[in-house]
Amino acid sequence: MRLRARVGVAVCMVLGAVALFKGFDGGLKDKSANAYNNELASNGPYSFFQAYRLNELSFQRFYRTLPQSEIRELVQHEVDEGAQASSAVITKTALAPSANVRPAQVVASGPEKRLNVVLIMVESLSADYLGVFGNKKNLTPKLDKLAEESLLLTNLYAIGTRTVRGLEALSAGLPPLPGQSIVRRPNNGNLFTLGSVLRERGYLTKFIYGGFGYFDNMNAYFAANGYEIIDRSSMPREKVGFANVWGVADEFLLNRTLEELDASHAAGKPVFAHVMTTSNHRPYTFPAGRIDLPSKSGRNGAVKYTDYAIGTFIEQARSKPWFDDTIFIVMADHCASSAGKEKLSIPKYHIPALVYAPKHVKPGRLDRLASQIDFPPTILAMLQMSYPSLFLGHDLTRSDHEEQRAFISNYQEIGYLRIGDDGAKRFVVLSPKKKVNVYRVAEDGETLLMEEGHEDLVREALVYY
């Protein structure tokens, strides 16, 4: 009797588990031709947890689109145009005949430069913290000095409000999609990236992060795309003099970057190091005695400490044998705050970027409107590389490419900022419920004035997104 009772309980548990699994399984949804019925079927625990995990919005369902055949044709045009802006010669060959979009072959106008590239993405560094952009608090003395010796981009905009947005823009060169960043989405490996192009040229590609890279799926994303991962878990305690909940202090992160560059040089390999800082983030703590502001003094102290760390890194790099053969890029991932008088407040996406390579990049200012997604092809153009390109961005160093545009987004709204032939700055905003608005940007750079028409501009935005 006892045995029979146990068997009965076991059977009930198995059946209960099956029923529970079926209750959470989303496989029964989308079986009906009726969209309302499908929504009812999906409105359960499985869909709740699935939506929480993926955090995605269906672009086709919620946003205005163009027919797929038209999109493919127009995207192909943009890929070809992006390549045209990156080289002297374009050969359009069917390098991937099965793909919807054919890569455009970029053929460099000169011999390839096998230079190291160090891309330092600075946490939350809004342009208005820098003295070169008008700040009077002397928060960035080292970056301001470095800007005088660099190519300074004065009109660059972040694509989003989170670190993962900056990471996707600088790796894959893609405009932002509503919902979750590609970094956090499933099936995000083996993409066409800046790293994939450089690895084919024999580069070591490294993602170096001061925090634990499982946060926001960073390690999984970069590993799935062929990067070597170096994060906080890779850094011996004796080499980390200070850390907080977000990561090791920036000076120790950059010390590790120096070690990686030394090792790559010793191995005779060029390296692309994508470095992500953490110190300019709450709780805004950092080692004592570095700057004239105390730890926990808020954002200003954290900005000045990060400035100190980057300046010290550059000074140390100048004594290295690989310095003359290295391009250093300093850029923010996003701004410190996105709140403004508009849902998408354009000034709240304005970020600094400077390119420093005394032997290879002439100092100056680049004032054209630009996006983070323009940097992968720009970096490759500086290296004078020939490659099959799927990038939508443009080489910013070419003055003969007239199109000036940028992309910005929050979770649901995505914007396309464009300077027209008439010199006016207009802004297309795509929102859920297939809503599209076109604005002229007022003289203050933030106020948006509604305008009618401009269907050609709307089509441009729809193609990119």
Roles of regions detected by a PLM:
Residues 80-465:
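Solvent-exposed soluble domains appended to multi-pass membrane proteins
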